[in-house]
């Protein structure tokens, strides 16, 4: 069956597919000011390296919880020689009609910390979490190309991004766990005289750790089920076999949450001496790993060729986009940076079909106009030059 037909057949019928119809930037990265009207579900940004294509995708990514696709400090997003702050506005067309969403960073005000701001129809919103009722986003960037061969921490961050797109509160819990672990490590380093301080810290660590591990495990389990139902041996984007490894994940899998918390608290207490000597907590979700294998070949992803890894990652991102749609009822906007650069024409054509079949808005960037030639009748193709975007040829 054709990729588009498979995707449509598998998609629940009550989904909404929000699309950006207008994008306004002020003092964001290389853009002093930009007001862009959009009329397609597939948007292609072409231009030379350094022209500002990725900056546009990054601006969109800041409407999701977290630090965006570059994981940059927000102050870095402000235009050099600008006010020190920035503003992003999008007009979204969805099931509720049109809604205007805003995100930005206030300019510096003396010694006060800069505040990140969000708005819905010009009214203040408490956080990016509030925007999740209007849009979801997933992305793939060249910075993810070393995911399978790099350190486990990169795969944990990737997994947490997958969870965050389904559960917008996950990032708050992960940040809370990191703070709780730092607090425990500090108490161990200082040799806390009152053990009740350590017990309180370990209680918080255990509670958050089990919650984080359970959310990761749930997302992986759902993704495994989706991939298993949809996988095809001969797909140009091979299916991934994924598994989550870690001591806390094993506890969560084998017992109720409260029992897992009790057991992990006991492990923390037993390992205080060892952790103090190491200067860090040695057991916890912060040491887990996401194991990925090339399904058709049965090889660990890190053993595959560079091209196979790229295709495997793209297949995983596409599967995750389907999971987000099924879990939230909102087809995510997909951001793909330099996605076509390393794919041959056959695989590019297959990718475009898969993206159309997903049913949501897709943004792609690339330096080579020819890579998107077959999309002339299906996409809005825009030409990016420094600080400016215009209609392509």
Model-derived segments and spans:
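An accessory alpha-helical subdomain
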Residues: 144-236, 245-248
């Amino acid at each position: 069956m054709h990729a588009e037909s498979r995707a449509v057949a598998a998609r629940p019928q009550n989904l909404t597919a929000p699309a950006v119809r207008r994008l306004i930037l002020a003092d964001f990265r290389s853009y002093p000011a930009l007001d862009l009207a959009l009329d397609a579900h597939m948007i292609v940004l072409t231009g030379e390296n350094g022209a500002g294509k990725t900056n546009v995708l990054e601006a969109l990514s800041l409407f999701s919880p977290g630090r965006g696709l570059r994981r940059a400090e927000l102050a870095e997003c402000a235009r050099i020689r600008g006010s020190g702050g920035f503003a992003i506005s999008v007009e979204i067309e969805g099931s509720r009609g049109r809604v205007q969403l805003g995100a930005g960073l206030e300019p510096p005000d003396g010694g006060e910390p800069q505040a990140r701001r969000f708005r819905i129809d010009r009214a203040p919103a408490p956080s990016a979490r509030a925007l999740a009722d209007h849009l979801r986003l997933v992305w793939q960037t060249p910075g993810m190309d070393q995911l399978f061969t790099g350190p486990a921490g990169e795969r944990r961050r990737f997994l947490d991004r997958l969870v965050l797109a389904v559960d917008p509160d996950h990032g708050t819990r992960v940040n809370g766990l990191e703070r709780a672990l730092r607090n425990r490590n500090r108490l161990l380093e200082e040799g806390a005289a009152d053990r009740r301080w350590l017990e309180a810290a370990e209680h918080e660590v255990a509670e958050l750790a089990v919650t984080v591990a359970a959310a990761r495990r749930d997302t992986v389990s759902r993704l495994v089920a989706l991939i298993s139902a949809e996988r095809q041996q001969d797909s140009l984007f091979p299916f991934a076999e994924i598994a989550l490894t870690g001591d806390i994940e094993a506890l969560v899998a084998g017992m109720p949450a409260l029992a897992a918390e009790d057991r992990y608290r006991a492990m923390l207490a037993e390992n205080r001496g060892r952790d103090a000597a190491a200067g860090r907590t040695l057991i916890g979700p912060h040491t887990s790993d996401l194991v990925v294998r090339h399904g058709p070949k049965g090889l660990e992803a890190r053993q595959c060729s560079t091209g196979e890894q790229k295709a495997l990652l793209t297949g995983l991102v596409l599967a995750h986009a389907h999971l987000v749609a099924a879990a939230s009822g909102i087809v995510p906007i997909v951001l793909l940076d330099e996605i076509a650069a390393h794919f041959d024409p056959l695989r590019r054509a297959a990718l475009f079909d898969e993206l159309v079949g997903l049913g949501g808005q897709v943004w792609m960037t690339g330096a080579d106009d020819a890579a998107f030639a077959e999309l002339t009748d299906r996409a809005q193709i825009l030409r990016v030059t420094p600080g400016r975007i215009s209609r392509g040829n």
